Amino acid sequence: MRLVERHIIKKNHRFYAEIDRLCFLSKNLYNYANYLVRQSFIFENTYRNYHDIQKTLQSQLDYQAMPAKVSQQVLMILDRNWISFKESNLAYKESPSKFKGRPALPGYKHKIKGRNVVVYTAQAIRKKQFKRGIINPSKTEIYLKTKVDTSNKTCSWRGNLAELPCSKIKQVRLVPRLNHYIIEVIYEADQQQYELEENRYASIDIGLNNLATLTFNQAGIKPLLINGRPLKSINQYYNKVKSELQSLLGENKSSQKLRKLCNKREFKINDYLHKASRLIIDTLINKKIGTLIIGHNTDWKQKINLGKRNNQNFVFIPYNKLIEMLSYKAEMVGIKVIFTEEYYTSKASFLDNDPIPVYQKGKKIK
């Protein structure tokens, strides 16, 4: 499976200016290509796909400002956004009730402040530096040490063993954020082998004071509780300082302090969720648990009613991010993950082997 190694580049970093320039050029190409696609779609009711746009823009200045492979990736991202819009729009016409609103056309990036992601494929990374464990995207002065294995291996090509370098690195992405950039090294990771038993189950109940409660179907194994109060504390501090700053700025304004506050909160929460998910997976490995059941409800944040204060704490905690971390870390070690609805778990007894029903949506009749 594919994993991501992340490097945070702040404004005082030596690579910041060059990355900012590249993301600005990417924005220019994205906006120009998006303009052409939108005009055709709105006025001619036709869709210009990637191949059509790429052929049109090959000689254009914004396209030539970056390496060809990088410009192609920008157009591919735009093409995926339009395909997603078309599919969503079709689904909306068939069943509007499944959506919270009508899908919008892919929009433009801000002319001055806007930045767009820059993607370098494995072919656009300099091989000489790559062999030494250094990522150097083509035609840049960015030299980044990576922990990913960059040793050369032989690859199977159409059944024949060819002497070609088989790198685990697939892409390098320059991702713009609020006031910093993230260099993402996307690589292929092999599944680790452990002696696990698929009939040994563990289930996770996600909550507020207890972020996760891990229970087992094997007698004698104590449940594992992951404390959720540190996340509540992070959110409470964030909400308090944010309200103070916004009272000075006005509701629709932002500031450098506010952006730093948002980044600090995000980094702290991600760090805590990574550590919590790693502890859970390590516990499953030690107990030889082969199957993990995760309770999850669709739209649980939109429909929850725990009171004003609890609602604020619950909604601000990114539970889906925790579930994603658990899922990919479980897959990495060969643990099977099963998702189940939680609507009726409180009415069913595990000790009595009660089934957990799943009901279709319908109108309540009094």
Language-model regions, residue ranges each:
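Nucleic-acid substrate recognition interfaces
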Residues: 1-366
